[in-house]
């Protein structure tokens, strides 16, 4: 979706299939400093959707915030609707106060709060619901359950939001 319109670069850690692509950089969130990659690429926009240990990601985002404060660069942080997971039975909106009971939601809140030191024009927080894709683990799990006739657990009276990987990339583009 984005490739025809922008010079795109990415990072990988365990997906070695990207190692031969010149627009991908090896980056281990636990051992490497993200600024090494950022200073090579000199991006105008960083889309942050890292995986890895929570504290290593928090440290990475501290480096990114410091960089963005001093350079012509913006950050789109891919967060999660888990920042509202304490509110099970009604919808939450972007202006609502975050409150999470899960470690994952609290971790995302910690990074979101670190971004508040930036000028509002320098960052966007995209709080994603469950994201499904053709080869996503959640999709594969549901397909396997349907194929085997295994019941799929549902949660009545709970608001659930979902999107697809393709719809997400379209929305990032616009």
Language model regions located:
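SDR active-site strand-loop-helix element
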Residues: 11, 49, 75-81, 126-128
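NAD(P)-cofactor binding segment of oxidoreductase domains
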Residues: 37-77
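Non-catalytic, hydrophobic alpha-helical segments
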Residues: 168-172
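N-terminal Rossmann/SDR dinucleotide-binding element
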Residues: 1-45
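Catalytic helix-loop patch of NAD(P)-dependent Rossmann-fold dehydrogenases
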Residues: 83-126, 133
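Residues at the starts of beta-strands that form the adenosine-phosphate
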Residues: 5-9, 74, 122
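Conserved catalytic-core motifs of eukaryotic protein kinase domains, centered on the activation segment
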Residues: 21, 56-59, 86-90
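NAD(P)-dependent short-chain dehydrogenase/reductase
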Residues: 113-160, 167
